[in-house]
Amino acid sequence: MSNAFIKVENLSFSYESDSEAHTIPAVKDVSFEINEGEYIAVLGHNGSGKSTLAKLLNFILEPTSGKIFVDGKEITSEDIVDDDIYDLRRKIGMVFQNPDNQIVATIVEEDVAFGPENLGLHPSEIRQRVDEALKIVGMTEYIKHEPHRLSGGQKQRIAIAGVIAMRPRCIIFDESTAMLDPIGRREVISTMQKLNKEENLTVINITHYMDEAAMADRIIVLNGGSLIIDGTPEEVFSNQDKLTEIGLDVPQSVALANKLKAAGIKLEGKTLTPDSCAEAIYKALIARGTQS
């Protein structure tokens, strides 16, 4: 047994179709490990199986076959009981695409307190958790506000605070920025990074945005329910032709860097973001200037 926080072995899942004789495969024989504190992006186009995988990891869906281990315990075992599932969901929280579907109260602090209250915690402990969670997501000043009056990004941060208040060790973001405008996306992405770097939470970001995936420690690429690439952003985006074949692009900065490298211009360092790419190009130009 490995020391991975999440371990998936030969995981498969099929949805039932209209015909009882047929099923629709969504995840096919997928295996990987995630260590505690990692920042993982799961990348794929629509229908690739990434959201289904997210629901399997939180046991919202039960796999057709294969095994899932969380913190060393097999949650797909026949011996699993309801208390084990509740414990799993305290360890692994989820933030969904539409924050309106996750917000349950009419006042921000009451919404964030909903989960801890259902754990039967003492009011003082609930108060502490609510205050800490809102501080982490930068929404303390909105504690008495009505969630429906907030922007999309602010609502999503309230939804995240509600998950944080449960004290999970991992949060799965299931396309949590897909419905947000650019400002809201930046707010939520910044929150993901803060949770990972400052709070040491394991973050799994299910996304189809290349720039979001580029921020992860590791990227898992799904296509047609199968895992086709698993590596660092640099390793994954170096497979530009393979990504193009399955309908995915690479970040613009990476595409530019790849063209320059193909033209014989040597770039040093990372080129995953516009700033890092610009710095690499600048250094390459300086180097070429000193050689001429």
Predicted regions and their residues:
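Conserved ABC transporter NBD signature motif
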Residues: 66-77, 88
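Conserved ABC ATPase "signature" region
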Residues: 124-142
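Conserved ABC ATPase signature
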Residues: 146-150, 154
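Helix-to-loop junction immediately C-terminal to a conserved catalytic motif
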Residues: 58
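The feature captures the beta-strand-to-loop junction immediately N-terminal to the Walker
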Residues: 43-45
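Catalytic Walker B motif of ABC-type/P-loop ATPase nucleotide-binding domains
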Residues: 171-174
